């Protein structure tokens, strides 16, 4: 390049910056052809990185017409709306989001003229070979092939030279390729280009329809096109290739050989399909294998390998060099693509080290090798900043530190690293995925930085899309100084080459300022480039290379240099096409800038040093012309010139540091100019100074301060070397360079000469080359990090030589599974074949031997055969492959197709899971997850596939991977059809078993219950369920144990946010669902509180909740004190809950249930509540029950109304589907409530239902009155009290039905101790002074509270109602009325919500009045009633003061105070008057006055001061609708009948009948009239209530009853159960401690001998016990009676012959394992024995047994000869056996424990010795003397923790591989012979009947309780804990088991 600045500028003006290499001639030709033949705008085309094809940006419609084979193909439309820069960005690989309607395709081209050679050999395979392969056939084919190959080999060697037979027929390669492509891709070529009449079309006629491609593992072709000169294959764009996986996401394949083999399996399938059709795949590389997130690989053929190079093109033009041997810039720029053969990295490194190429050129080549792409915003080439612009004259930047480190400072990087390290450790300990990985640097050059750098040249739209959405041109750095200061990232090449980057294209953004020491951008670029080439930089550049591309990116060096990059250490498994790439793993050699270290002349002695420096100081001045700056590229000015002395040491001797630093950079520029002139003189002046100043160990270019001292002052005799001189340096550098070249770059490549000429190319030769390319590709995958330094377009033979060398040098790095296949494909064991570049492009690398190890040369079908041992493909691969192909083949448009697909997959899943390993599950799982998260398949996938997949995964992984998609399936409202499957009790039982009870209750149950609140519930409302828990937990104080008060159970379980711990991090990163679902879930939970996102702006719930705790807590305790004495004595408690024959009923119902269970194929033991059905004769719940139970109690209408409403139902619900869905869900909730028992049902089911009830009323739509066909509009004239349900009442029907069912099941305490306190919490005002502000959720809470109170009042007995009446008045009615009648509180939904609340409250108060009678109303309810009526007077007065009030109210900031006639002053919000007047109208006055005047009679005058005013208003209303009506106020209401009729305590009195509470039918005018036909004919003691059953709230008329009795249930709470339940619902779920109160709950007598072992089933509703009486019994854990009742076993297993000492459950298949010296496996549903394992020798019995955790199905048995044996239930015989003794005599194995992961087993011996064994390998990990006595029991806990107890009275906690115990507990009196674990606590039992609780984490401290003889008789023999229910099962030596809490 010319030296002048003009020439440089010319070169820099090229649009791409002038420094990156242009495309090769072949690529330019392909680009021109595609532009010409396909009419695609050249701006929409880009060469692919590998140089094999063109990427085109095309409209999707154009591509569709191409796919549909429409001819003629029109020109491709241009990207009109997009600028050139945007189009260029969209063509970059790392960009994934494209504008709508646009897509990218790959166009692969073949030049016809290069296919003119003959191609010999036909199809190598017969098509008939597609039947199932058998061993016989495989052997026959191998023998035939061997025979054929040996014959041919012999013929070629001995026969052919003498044979004169004609040459075998050969076809032109063009025809052969064209036909093979059509067969493989299943479509024919379309003519394109200038003449669409290609010769082949004349013959073939019109285009046939598209067929199917030969193999699904082959990348499909969108179209095959033919122009006169070219053949094109158009492929869909490949986003990620296998090269991206091994380069940027290597963790995707680590630790799993199955994944690598599966990719190979699919590639071989594709190659086999191509070879069968006679098509060679070409010189395959990692770039040719397309991979998606689920690791489904597709092969993309390398068609260019078919092209034979033309003769003239074969000769490469030699690179011109000038005399000094340096490649000049012009040649470098013009030489296409830097030809790989000549410029291999080795020579590149040497050229740079010796100064033959410039720094810039070398760094650009390193960028290219790392895959960095010009113009890619995410992966642009990166160069170092070399100058610090922040100082006035600039100074050199420290290249030993990364820019990130210089910018952020060491402190911040250390802080980042330490914080992420701590988070990583904490995350790892928690067992979930580590949230953070310790790192210092997040990115080297981010896309934001790239766009900011290029902001002046980038269109505004792009900047707004990437940098910041708002256009703020002045926010972008305005100068180089600010730019460099702002960014932690490195520089880009444009700042060294392109002056245009400084000039702005935006009118409102100024140009980028250059530093003050430059006058223009051209001058700056020239100076900047010169600085890059300066010797200061050259000498330190290798440090920067080590930091950016080299060994300092990983390991200890990276930590030391604070250079740990997140991308390299985060082990991410999502695919990426950019990242940080490490090229070198050895220290990079230093550039030998200046004179060599070993100079021809000796160095000067130190005495002269000071003198020389002082002499040279005066000789320096800055008189040079800065215009003569060399560009430092064209010649070796800076690198090889020995001029260092003239400036490096030109430094002030004193400490003038600032000046010294500030002038550094400028010095180097000015001095570089005269370097050439001083070449001779300066080196003669001080020859020795040069040689050691270069190698100075101090900061480059800076002299050591100590050099100023006189070194000659020391001892005379010692030889003093010059400062910084190292005589060994030259040798060390030589060693370093050699080491780097040998280890880092893989040694030398020899290129022997071997010319060859071959006429026709046999097809077999091409196919063999394919196999060799496959071998090279596999080796490149294995050695991915070592072959990064190969060029992407390196020829096959270069790649082969490289990988062959690597395989020889590093054989241990090749995985065992790939060693045989690499050896077969690359003939590693054979002699090394010398080969050269001139070997033809079409030749194979070497010839395979005709027979090798008995097999013919490798081909895909041979490698795929199950009978060939070359590749060890697991046996499940074919089934897995078929499963995936079926998944990919079906396109699902609707639900029917979705169901068909899932059903078909389900049929295949069994074959896949039969032999699958965990590695295989990793491949399968992403497909199942994406099915579970796609709309049309989610429900059916859950129904069909959840059970088998979760069974294979085990509970831990099922929670980790399947929980989130399950939540998605439950939350998706559009999935109505078939959704009821997910709510069947059978499916929910599977969920509980496979996820684990606790995980199901905590994470999934809230989402399951959501459906009850209506399918149309919005996402926000439904998510409130999860969040409300936290609000309530934070808003209310937890009541202490023992207090049974309103509100005590409100502290809800502190469930973690649904998203925490449920992320799906690992192999599922391909599933799109999770990426979307993560966002809202995580965002909604801020600081543990749920922030609602509703359409209207509203207060966060937490605001009012915080305030409401003060008031409610005081009332809670006071109520508890009053109520407590009643607990035992209330009549409901004992007498009514136990029917005499309930046990008889139970037996009958249990029998029928078991049949149902078997029909339902349920996997779980369950006990439906048949008992209640027997007792109460209830019917099933139907939807009509649920919907009609919504009406307000004081409602009615005639029977006709009810019928009309039933007819209107289908319109109200969403038809039959919705009805089935709600029916199924209600039935399931009823079943679940009984199954879970009272405490768990109250904590999890009831609490969630109560929260749901509020969401049923949220939003204005739910607050509309429902108008059925025959009904008048709201509050119409005439018949005032009608059925007035709002939509929310209909929606809340199923929720109320389920809530009342729980009350029926467990009795009245549920209403008074759980529901009423929750109601008082809902309605409590937010602060002590007056009502709080309402938000829409609080408003809905008020409506829900009043509705639920109404339901509860009906079911309360008279005594209970009277007991809690004061509380209802003060804690429910008055707070509701304070909101309703408030003059300052507005309702978010305005008058509508207030009107509904008003109507509901009237109904509620009227209901209570009817229940308690006039006297009690006067005594207890006068205040609420008076408050209600008072509001009319207040509004009346306000209306009169209206004029005076308004101006005052508007003027002040605070609310005006108004004095009312009662003398009180109240604040009034003038803005609310309108709302209040809309609600409290004349009509409302009439609505209130008439019923209360009837109900209260004369008392109304005593308790309602303003009754006359309200009466007048009511009269006005009557006049307005019918002027002739009488004034009701003037007429005394006449009471019907006599007093006793209103006596609430009467037996069968009228209020029990269906109509007495329904004013619509009873009010005639203003009289209450009881219709004759409504009286029951024979009302018994239960009256009409007997019809009300477990189904729902019965019929509509029952629903209007004033009082209904709760039916007696065998599960009703009384006695100890009631006391324990009251305590338990008040305890916070956050409490992780186990509290033992010795409350006796149930007894299980039946064993005739001592109970040896007890084991609860995982669902905690049944448990197993084994005894000395040789039986195993299965017991139900449902609550009965008051704590004194006894329960009979459900099943007795009697097949044992000796005493049973072990019983447990195999979780995966749900079988029971019990042992009496022989192991029995049996079915708990039927009691049938499935398998018996007898000891091999009766003299060596089994002494200990343990079952492996799910998903394993093995049993581990220890025999008395210290041998461990493993049995798999699915297979006959033993799996394997391991010896434990090992020469010692540790005694008998007493106890076995298996770690929760199943990876290790620990055995405890009678001698106190313990042995830890790896279950996978059988290796003994550790053996140690743990105790001094017999080991009694061992348990293994998560986190590799073991707990052991011994007869030496100790209990010890161990870490698996640590020598010392972490905790040691000593029991004083007796040894701990039995214990169980609760979280991080151990619950222990001793022979002296003491129960202790001690912690695994905290220092030893133990709380012990002695069991009282009243609660536990006999001696404690065994103990088991129910973790969810928090109960203890204690077995005794007298055969009785007791349940205590």
Swiss-Prot record:
InterPro entries, A to Z: BEACH_dom, BEACH_dom_sf, Kinase-like_dom_sf, WD40/YVTN_repeat-like_dom_sf, WD40_repeat_dom_sf, WD40_rpt, WDR81
One record GO biological process: protein stabilization
Compartments it resides in: Early endosome membrane; Late endosome membrane; Lysosome membrane; Cytoplasmic vesicle, Autophagosome membrane
This protein's GO CC annotations: autophagosome membrane; cytosol; early endosome membrane; endosome membrane; late endosome membrane; lysosomal membrane; mitochondrion
Functional summary from the UniProt entry: Functions as a negative regulator of the PI3 kinase/PI3K activity associated with endosomal membranes via BECN1, a core subunit of the PI3K complex. By modifying the phosphatidylinositol 3-phosphate/PtdInsP3 content of endosomal membranes may regulate endosome fusion, recycling, sorting and early to late endosome transport. It is for instance, required for the delivery of cargos like BST2/tetherin from early to late endosome and thereby participates indirectly to their degradation by the lysosome.
Alphabetical UniProt keywords: Cytoplasm, Cytoplasmic vesicle, Disease variant, Endosome, Intellectual disability, Lysosome, Membrane, Mitochondrion, Repeat, Transit peptide, WD repeat
Tissues expressed in: Widely expressed. In the brain, highest levels in cerebellum and corpus callosum.
Subunit structure: Interacts with WDR91; involved in early to late endosome cargo transport. Interacts with BECN1; negatively regulates the PI3 kinase/PI3K activity associated with endosomal membranes. Interacts with SQSTM1; the interaction is direct and regulates the interaction of SQSTM1 with ubiquitinated proteins. Interacts with MAP1LC3C; recruits MAP1LC3C to ubiquitinated protein aggregates in the aggrephagy process.
Its membrane topology: Peripheral membrane protein
Residue ranges, compositional bias (Acidic residues): 1151-1174
Region of interest (Necessary and sufficient for the interaction with SQSTM1), ranges: 1-650
WD repeat residue numbers: 1639-1677, 1686-1724, 1729-1769, 1777-1815, 1819-1856, 1860-1896, 1902-1941
Family: Belongs to the WD repeat WDR81 family.
Domain BEACH: 337-614
PANTHER family attached to this UniProt entry: WD REPEAT-CONTAINING PROTEIN 81
Involvement in disease: Cerebellar ataxia, impaired intellectual development, and dysequilibrium syndrome 2: An autosomal recessive, congenital cerebellar ataxia associated with cerebellar hypoplasia, intellectual disability, and inability to walk bipedally, resulting in quadrupedal locomotion as a functional adaptation. Additional findings include generalized brain atrophy and mild hypoplasia of the corpus callosum. Hydrocephalus, congenital, 3, with brain anomalies: A form of congenital hydrocephalus, a disease characterized by onset in utero of enlarged ventricles due to accumulation of ventricular cerebrospinal fluid. HYC3 features include enlarged ventricles, hypoplastic or absent cerebellum, holoprosencephaly and Dandy-Walker malformation. Most patients die in utero or shortly after birth. HYC3 inheritance is autosomal recessive.
Ranges of Polar residues composition bias in the record: 1137-1146
Superkingdom of the source species: Eukaryota
UniProt main location, coarse: membrane
The keyword GTP-binding is annotated on this UniProt entry: no
Name of protein: WD repeat-containing protein 81
Phenotype when changing residue 547 to A: Loss of interaction with MAP1LC3C
Keyword set includes Membrane: yes
Biased composition (Gly residues): 1586-1595
Pfam families reported for this sequence: Beach, WD40
Region (Disordered): 1-27, 618-637, 694-718, 1022-1074, 1097-1217, 1523-1556, 1569-1602
């Amino acid at each position: 390049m010319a030296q002048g600045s003009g020439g440089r500028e010319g070169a820099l003006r090229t649009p791409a910056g002038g420094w990156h290499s242009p495309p090769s001639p072949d690529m330019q030709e392909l680009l021109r052809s595609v532009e010409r033949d396909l009419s695609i705008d050249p701006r929409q085309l880009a060469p692919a990185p590998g140089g094999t094809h063109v990427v085109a940006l095309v409209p999707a419609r154009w591509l569709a017409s191409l796919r549909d084979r429409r001819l003629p193909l029109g020109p491709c439309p241009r990207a009109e709306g997009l600028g050139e820069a945007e189009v260029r960005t969209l063509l970059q690989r790392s960009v994934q989001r494209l504008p709508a309607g646009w897509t990218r395709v790959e166009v692969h081209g073949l030049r016809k003229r290069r296919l003119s050679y003959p191609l010999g050999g036909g199809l190598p395979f017969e098509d008939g070979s597609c039947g199932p392969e058998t061993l016989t056939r495989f052997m026959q084919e191998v023998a035939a092939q061997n025979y054929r190959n040996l014959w041919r080999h012999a013929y070629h060697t001995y026969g052919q030279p003498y044979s004169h037979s004609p040459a075998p027929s050969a076809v032109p390669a063009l025809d052969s390729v064209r036909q093979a492509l059509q067969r493989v891709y299943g479509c024919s070529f379309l003519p394109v280009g200038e003449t669409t009449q290609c010769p082949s079309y004349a013959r073939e006629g019109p285009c046939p329809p598209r067929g199917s491609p030969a193999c699904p593992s082959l990348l499909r072709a969108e179209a095959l096109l033919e122009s006169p000169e070219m053949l094109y294959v158009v492929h869909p764009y490949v986003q990620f290739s296998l090269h991206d996986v091994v380069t940027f996401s290597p963790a995707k394949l680590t630790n799993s050989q199955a994944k690598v083999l599966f990719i190979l399996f699919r590639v071989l399938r594709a190659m086999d399909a191509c070879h069968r059709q006679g098509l060679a795949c070409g010189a395959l590389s990692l770039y040719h294998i397309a991979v998606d997130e689920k690791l489904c690989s597709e092969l993309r053929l390398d068609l260019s390998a078919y092209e034979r190079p033309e003769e003239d093109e074969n000769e490469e033009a030699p690179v011109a060099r000038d005399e000094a041997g340096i490649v000049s810039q012009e040649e470098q720029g013009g030489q296409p693509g830097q030809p790989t053969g000549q410029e291999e990295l080795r020579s590149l490194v040497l050229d740079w080290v010796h100064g033959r190429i410039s720094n810039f050129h070398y760094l650009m080549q390193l960028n290219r090798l790392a895959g960095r792409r010009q113009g890619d915003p995410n992966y642009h080439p990166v160069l170092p900043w070399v100058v610090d612009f922040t100082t006035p004259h600039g100074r050199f930047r420290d290249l030993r530190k990364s820019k990130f480190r210089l910018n952020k400072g060491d402190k911040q990087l250390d802080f980042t690293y330490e914080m992420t390290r701590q988070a990583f450790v904490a995350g790892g300990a928690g067992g979930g995925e580590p949230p953070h990985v310790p790192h210092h640097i997040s990115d080297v050059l981010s896309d934001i930085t790239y766009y900011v750098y290029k902001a002046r040249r980038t269109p505004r739209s792009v900047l707004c899309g990437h940098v910041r959405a708002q256009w703020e041109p002045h926010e972008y750095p305005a100068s180089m100084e600010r730019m460099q200061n702002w960014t932690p990232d490195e520089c880009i090449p444009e700042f060294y080459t392109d002056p245009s980057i400084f000039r702005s294209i935006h009118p409102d953004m100024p140009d980028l300022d250059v530093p003050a020491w430059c006058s223009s951008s051209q001058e700056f670029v020239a100076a900047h480039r010169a600085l890059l080439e300066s010797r200061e930089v050259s000498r330190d550049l290798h440090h920067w290379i080590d930091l950016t591309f080299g060994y300092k990116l990983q390991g200890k060096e990276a930590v030391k240099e604070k250079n740990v990059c997140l991308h390299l250490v985060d082990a991410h498994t999502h695919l990426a096409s950019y990242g940080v790439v490490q090229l070198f793993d050895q220290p990079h050699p230093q550039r030998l800038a200046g004179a060599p270290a070993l100079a021809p002349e000796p160095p000067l002695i130190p005495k002269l040093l000071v003198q020389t420096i002082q002499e040279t100081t005066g000789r320096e001045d800055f008189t040079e012309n800065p215009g003569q700056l060399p560009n430092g590229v064209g010649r070796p000015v800076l690198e090889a010139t020995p001029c260092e002395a003239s400036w490096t040491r030109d430094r002030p001797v004193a400490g003038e540091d600032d000046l010294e630093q500030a002038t550094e950079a400028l010095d180097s520029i000015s001095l570089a100019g005269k370097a050439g002139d001083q070449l001779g003189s300066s080196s003669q002046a001080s020859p020795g100074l040069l040689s050691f100043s270069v190698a100075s160990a101090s900061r480059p270019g800076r002299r050591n301060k100590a050099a100023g001292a006189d070194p000659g002052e020391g001892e005379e005799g010692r030889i003093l070397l010059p400062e910084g001189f190292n005589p060994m340096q030259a040798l060390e550098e030589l060693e370093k360079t050699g080491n780097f070249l040998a280890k880092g770059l893989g040694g030398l490549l020899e290129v022997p000469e071997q010319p060859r000429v071959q006429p026709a190319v046999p097809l077999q030769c091409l196919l063999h080359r394919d196999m060799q390319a496959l071998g090279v590709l596999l080796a490149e995958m294995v050695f991915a990090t070592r072959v990064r330094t190969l060029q992407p377009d390196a020829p096959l033979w270069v790649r082969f030589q490289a990988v062959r060398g690597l395989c020889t040098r590093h054989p241990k790095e090749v995985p065992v599974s790939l060693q045989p296949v690499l050896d077969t494909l690359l003939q590693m064991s054979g002699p090394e074949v010398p080969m050269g570049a001139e070997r033809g492009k079409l030749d194979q690398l070497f010839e395979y031997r005709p027979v090798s190890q008995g097999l013919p040369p490798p081909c895909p079908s041979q490698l795929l055969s199950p009978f060939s041992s070359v590749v060890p493909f697991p046996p499940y691969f074919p089934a897995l492959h078929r499963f995936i192909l079926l998944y990919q083949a079906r396109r699902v448009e609707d639900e029917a197709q979705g169901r068909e697909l899932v059903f078909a997959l389900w049929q295949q899943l069994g074959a896949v899971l039969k032999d699958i390993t965990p590695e295989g599950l990793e491949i399968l799982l992403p497909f199942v997850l994406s099915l579970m998260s796609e709309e049309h398949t989610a429900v059916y996938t859950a129904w069909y596939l959840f059970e088998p997949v979760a069974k294979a995964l085990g509970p831990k992984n099922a929670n980790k991977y399947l929980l989130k998609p399950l939540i998605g399936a439950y939350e998706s409202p559009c999935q109505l059809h078939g959704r009821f499957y997910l709510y069947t009790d059978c499916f929910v039982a599977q969920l509980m078993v496979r996820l684990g009870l606790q995980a199901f209750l905590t994470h999934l149950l809230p989402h399951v219950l959501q459906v009850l609140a209506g399918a149309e519930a919005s996402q926000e409302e439904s998510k409130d369920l999860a969040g409300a828990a936290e609000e309530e937990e934070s808003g209310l104080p937890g009541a202490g144990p023992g207090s049974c008060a309103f509100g005590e159970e409100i502290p809800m379980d502190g469930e973690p946010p649904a998203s925490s711990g449920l992320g799906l991090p690992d192999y599922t990163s391909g599933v799109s669902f999770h990426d979307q679902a993560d966002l809202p879930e995580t965002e909604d939970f801020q600081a543990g509180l749920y922030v609602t996102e509703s359409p209207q702006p509203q207060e966060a719930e937490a605001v009012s909740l915080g305030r409401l705790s003060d008031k409610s807590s005081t009332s809670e305790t006071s109520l508890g004190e009053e109520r407590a004495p009643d607990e035992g004595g209330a009549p409901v408690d004992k007498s009514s809950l136990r029917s005499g024959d309930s046990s008889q009923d139970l037996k009958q119902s249990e029998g029928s249930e078991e049949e149902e269970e078997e029909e339902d194929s349920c996997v779980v033991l369950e006990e439906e509540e048949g008992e209640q059905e027997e007792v109460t004769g209830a019917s099933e719940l139907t939807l009509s029950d649920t919907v009609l139970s919504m009406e307000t109690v004081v409602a009615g209408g005639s029977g006709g109304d009810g019928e009309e409403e039933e007819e209107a139902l289908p319109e109200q619900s969403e038809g039959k589907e919705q009805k089935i869905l709600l029916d199924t869900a209600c039935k399931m909730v009823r079943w679940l409530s009984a199954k879970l028992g009272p405490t768990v049902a109250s904590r999890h089911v009831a609490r969630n239902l109560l929260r749901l009830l509020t969401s049923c009323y949220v939003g204005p739509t739910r607050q509309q009155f429902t108008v059925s066909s025959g009904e008048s509009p709201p509050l119409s004239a005439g018949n005032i009290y009608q059925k007035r349900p709002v939509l929310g009442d209909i929606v809340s029907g199923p929720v109320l039905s389920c809530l009342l069912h729980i009350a029926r099941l467990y009795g009245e305490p549920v209403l008074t101790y759980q529901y009423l306190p929750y109601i008082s919490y809902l309605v409590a005002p937010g602060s002590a002074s007056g009502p709080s502000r309402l938000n829409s959720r609080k408003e809905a809470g008020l409506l829900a509270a009043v509705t639920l109170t109404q339901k509860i009042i009906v079911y309360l007995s008279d005594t209970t109602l009277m007991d809690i009446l004061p509380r209802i008045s003060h804690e429910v009615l008055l707070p509701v009325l304070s909101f309703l009648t408030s003059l300052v509180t507005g309702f978010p939904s305005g008058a509508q919500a207030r009107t509904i609340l008003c109507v509901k409250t009237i109904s509620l108060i009227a209901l209570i009045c009817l229940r308690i009678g006039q006297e009690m109303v006067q005594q207890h309810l006068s205040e609420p009633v008076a408050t209600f009526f008072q509001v009319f007077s207040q509004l009346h007065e306000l209306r009169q003061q209206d004029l005076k009030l308004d101006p005052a109210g508007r003027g002040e900031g605070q609310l005006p105070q108004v004095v009312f006639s009662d003398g009180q002053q109240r604040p009034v919000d003038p803005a609310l008057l309108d709302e209040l007047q809309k609600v409290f109208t004349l009509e409302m006055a009439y609505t209130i006055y008439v019923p209360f005047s009837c109900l209260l009679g004369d008392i109304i005058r005593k308790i309602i001061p303003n009754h006359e005013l309200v009466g007048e208003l009511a009269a006005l209303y009557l006049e307005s609708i019918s002027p002739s009506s009488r004034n009701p106020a003037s007429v005394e209401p006449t009471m019907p009948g006599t007093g006793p009729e209103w006596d609430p305590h009467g037996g069968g009195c009228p209020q029990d009948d269906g109509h007495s509470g329904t004013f619509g039918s009873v009010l005639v005018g203003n009289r209450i009239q009881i219709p004759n036909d409504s009286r029951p004919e024979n009302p018994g003691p239960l009256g009409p209530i007997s019809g009300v059953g477990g189904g729902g709230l019965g019929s509509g008329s029952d629903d209007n009853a004033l009082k209904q009795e709760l039916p007696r249930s065998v599960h009703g709470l009384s006695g100890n159960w009631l006391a324990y339940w009251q305590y338990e619902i008040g305890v916070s779920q956050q409490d992780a401690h186990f509290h033992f109160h010795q409350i006796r709950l149930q007894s299980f007598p039946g064993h005739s001998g001592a109970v040896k072992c007890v084991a609860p089933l995982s669902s905690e509703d049944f448990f197993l016990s084994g005894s000395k009486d040789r039986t195993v019994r299965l017991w139900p854990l449902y609550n009965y009676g008051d704590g004194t009742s006894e329960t009979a076993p459900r099943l007795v297993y009697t097949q044992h012959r000796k005493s049973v000492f072990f019983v447990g459950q195999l979780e995966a298949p749900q079988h029971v394992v019990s042992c009496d010296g022989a192991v029995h496996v049996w079915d708990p549903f039927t009691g049938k024995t499935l398998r018996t394992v007898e000891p091999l020798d009766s003299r060596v019995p089994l002494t200990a047994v343990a079952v492996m955790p799910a998903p394993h199905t093995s049993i581990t048995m220890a025999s008395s000869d210290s041998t461990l044996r493993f049995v798999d239930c699915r297979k006959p015989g033993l799996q394997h056996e391991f010896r434990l003794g090992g020469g010692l005599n540790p005694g008998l194995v007493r106890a076995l424990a298996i770690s929760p992961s199943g990876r290790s087993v620990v055995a405890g011996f009678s001698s106190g010795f313990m042995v830890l064994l790896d279950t996978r390998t059988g290796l003994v990990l550790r053996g140690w003397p743990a105790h001094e006595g017999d080991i009694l029991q061992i348990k293994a806990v998560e986190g590799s923790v073991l707990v052991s107890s011994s007869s030496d009275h100790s209990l010890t906690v161990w870490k698996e591989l640590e020598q010392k115990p972490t905790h040691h507990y000593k029991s004083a009196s007796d040894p701990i012979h039995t214990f169980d674990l609760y979280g991080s606590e151990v619950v222990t039992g001793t022979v002296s009947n003491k129960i202790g609780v001690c912690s695994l984490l905290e220092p030893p401290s133990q709380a012990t309780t002695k069991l009282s003889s009243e609660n536990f008789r006999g001696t404690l023999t065994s103990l088991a804990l129910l973790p969810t229910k928090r109960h203890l099962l204690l077995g005794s030596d007298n055969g009785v088991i007791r349940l205590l809490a």
